[in-house]
């Protein structure tokens, strides 16, 4: 894509802009040099990173669709409130943005979320100073603990290219799975290699429903030597560095010298939590006091609602977390296993929290109907036999009973999912049809006072858009959607 020449040097750094869900549109303009033939505006994708390059930048990687736009300049308070920013070639850009930069000169510019901006900035500073992300040994994909300059873990980054079925997955589990058992390889109900969008989408749903069980998660771009790169990428990086060192005039023409950044989901790290399975085993041997049990029930119901709405196909008791906090005694977190459960009765007003992590295998485009059912493992817990509380019903029912709220949710997910270069609109509509069916069942279950286990036993429904119906902004179930039941069951069914 060609652009008019500007006064910026050829080695000006490209930019990454993370758009807040509240942002509606990003205006791009230069005070002296118009951008041509680039579009002058782009709709903000909730929770995703948009990459911006200065006019002199040129694409190097085949298959990358990256907008080449000018560097952001100062933002007025009014522009921030509206979720907009103007891009210019001001020399004070770095001082006027909440941003950081990685080794190759690329920047994350985060709008309307100073807390998350600071965390990303510290992560990039750490990478620059040699504190690299550490690969997590558990799991079947490449995921990394991201640290700040002091070495403290602040987030978990999961690159798209290193997902379980990604071409750069550093772990061999899925490779052997593909070779030894190809008939069961992958999950036929999921869009392949879009787990990072599923992670960010789960947080978006959690935020829209007011659940508060998913740690803040957004799609960003990061680069680190510890990520798994192909031999070609590493060789190209070494070659560019050598060219810059030996022939500076040639080296300066490259807009990227180091390794290429990777897009992926960045989830804030939660402190003090342990795997749910750890606590659940203790609850079996020594049940919680009644007040504490009720405190656990409320976030548990929110976890159920999240998983059911997004149809999480990978929810075991080892990938959601529980944190137990005592206001009177901090010894519980220090002693760990040595703290006897019988002493819990002496602790006043304990607080129990739940964190729903590992949401990368959700948003299927059809209900599981092949080999496996991918059940929710929480369905066999005692908490799943308790009817949804009035508090949960009052929180969720007013929202999901409104089809316009559901339409807004689908539109936000559309803006997020379409940022992936493999996005297919028809497949996305199928994903939303499944989600709308899940919401329809959830609405009925909450109205009838059912339990979580009764919820998952309800007939599976798909609510498809009726293109002959109303296409206006106000949506009604009767004239815009059609409801069908999905009767085919997987070979190995759990219920």
Swiss-Prot record:
Protein's UniProt keywords contain Metal-binding: no
**Which catalysed reactions does the entry list for this protein?**
a 1,2-diacyl-sn-glycero-3-phospho-(1D-myo-inositol) + ATP = a 1,2-diacyl-sn-glycero-3-phospho-(1D-myo-inositol 4-phosphate) + ADP + H(+)
Taken from the record, one Pfam family name reads PI3_PI4_kinase
Sequence ranges of Basic and acidic residues compositional bias? 1-11
Q: What class of enzyme is it?
A: transferase
According to the UniProt record, where is the region Disordered? 1-101
List keywords of the entry alphabetically: ATP-binding, Cell membrane, Cytoplasm, Endoplasmic reticulum, Endosome, Golgi apparatus, Kinase, Lipid metabolism, Membrane, Nucleotide-binding, Transferase
Tell me where in this chain the PI3K/PI4K catalytic domain is found.
Answer: 130-465
Query: Any idea which positions bind ATP?
Result: 143, 158, 267-270, 281-282, 358
Q: Name one GO cellular component term.
A: lysosomal membrane
Spell out the residue ranges making up region: Catalytic loop: 311-319
One MF term in GO for this entry?
A: 1-phosphatidylinositol 4-kinase activity
* Intracellular or extracellular location(s): Cytoplasm, Cytosol; Golgi apparatus membrane; Endoplasmic reticulum membrane; Cell membrane
Q: From which domain of life does this come?
A: Eukaryota
Q: Per the record, which residues fall in region Important for substrate binding?
A: 163-165
- From the UniProt record, give one GO term of the biological process aspect: endosome organization
**Region described as G-loop:** 136-142
Q: Does the keyword Nucleotide-binding apply?
A: yes
What's its EC?
Answer: 2.7.1.67
**Annotated spans, Important for interaction with membranes:** 171-184, 274-282, 371-380
- Record's bilayer topology term: Peripheral membrane protein
Region entry Activation loop: which residue ranges?
356-376
Task performed by this protein: Contributes to the overall PI4-kinase activity of the cell. This contribution may be especially significant in plasma membrane, endosomal and Golgi compartments. The phosphorylation of phosphatidylinositol (PI) to PI4P is the first committed step in the generation of phosphatidylinositol 4,5-bisphosphate (PIP2), a precursor of the second messenger inositol 1,4,5-trisphosphate (InsP3).
Which family is this protein grouped under?
A: Belongs to the PI3/PI4-kinase family. Type II PI4K subfamily.
Protein known as: Phosphatidylinositol 4-kinase type 2-beta
**What is the species listed in this Swiss-Prot or TrEMBL entry?**
Xenopus laevis (African clawed frog)
């Amino acid at each position: 894509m060609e652009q008019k020449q500007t006064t910026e040097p050829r080695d000006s750094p490209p930019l990454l802009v993370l758009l807040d869900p509240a942002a509606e549109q990003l205006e791009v303009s230069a005070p002296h040099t118009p951008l041509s033939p680039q579009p002058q505006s782009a709709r903000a994708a909730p929770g995703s990173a948009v990459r911006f390059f200065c006019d002199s930048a040129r694409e190097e990687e085949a298959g990358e669709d990256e907008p080449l736009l000018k560097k952001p300049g100062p933002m007025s308070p009014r522009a921030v409130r509206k979720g907009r920013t103007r891009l210019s070639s001001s020399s004070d850009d770095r001082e006027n943005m909440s941003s950081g930069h990685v080794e190759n000169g690329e920047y994350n510019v985060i709008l309307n979320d100073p807390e998350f901006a600071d965390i990303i900035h510290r992560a990039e500073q750490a990478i620059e100073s040699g504190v690299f992300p550490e690969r997590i040994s558990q799991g079947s994909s490449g995921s990394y603990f991201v640290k700040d300059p002091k070495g403290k873990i602040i987030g978990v980054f999961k690159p798209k290219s290193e997902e379980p079925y990604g071409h750069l997955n550093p772990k061999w589990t899925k490779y052997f799975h593909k070779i030894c058992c190809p008939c069961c390889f992958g999950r036929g109900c999921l869009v392949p290699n879009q787990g990072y969008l599923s992670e960010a989408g789960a947080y978006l749903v959690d935020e829209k429903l007011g659940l508060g069980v998913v740690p803040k998660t957004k799609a960003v771009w990061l680069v680190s030597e510890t990520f798994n790169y192909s031999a070609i990428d590493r060789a190209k990086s070494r070659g560019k560095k050598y060219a810059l060192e030996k022939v500076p005039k040639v080296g300066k023409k490259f807009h990227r010298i180091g390794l290429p950044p990777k897009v992926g989901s960045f989830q804030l790290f939660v402190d003090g939590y342990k795997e749910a399975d750890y606590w659940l085993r203790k609850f079996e041997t020594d049940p919680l006091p009644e007040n504490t049990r009720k405190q656990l029930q409320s976030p548990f119901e929110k976890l159920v609602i999240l998983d059911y709405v997004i149809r999480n196909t990978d929810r075991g008791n080892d990938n959601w977390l529980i944190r137990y906090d005592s206001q009177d005694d901090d010894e519980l977190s220090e002693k760990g296993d040595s703290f006897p459960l019988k002493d819990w009765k002496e602790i006043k007003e304990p607080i129990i929290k739940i964190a729903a992590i590992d949401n990368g295998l959700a948003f299927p485009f059809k209900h599981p109907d092949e080999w496996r059912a991918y059940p929710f493992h929480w369905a066999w817990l005692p908490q799943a036999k308790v009817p949804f509380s009035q508090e949960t019903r009052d929180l969720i029912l007013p929202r999901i009973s409104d089809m316009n709220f559901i339409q807004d949710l689908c539109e936000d997910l559309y803006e997020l999912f379409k940022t992936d270069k493999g996005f297919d609109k028809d497949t996305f509509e199928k994903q939303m049809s499944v989600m709308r069916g899940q919401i329809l069942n959830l609405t009925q279950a909450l109205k009838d006072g059912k339990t979580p286990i009764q919820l998952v036993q309800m007939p599976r429904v798909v609510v498809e858009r009726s293109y002959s119906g109303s296409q206006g902004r106000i949506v009604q179930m009767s004239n815009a959607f059609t409801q069908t039941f999905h009767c085919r069951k997987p070979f190995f069914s759990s219920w």
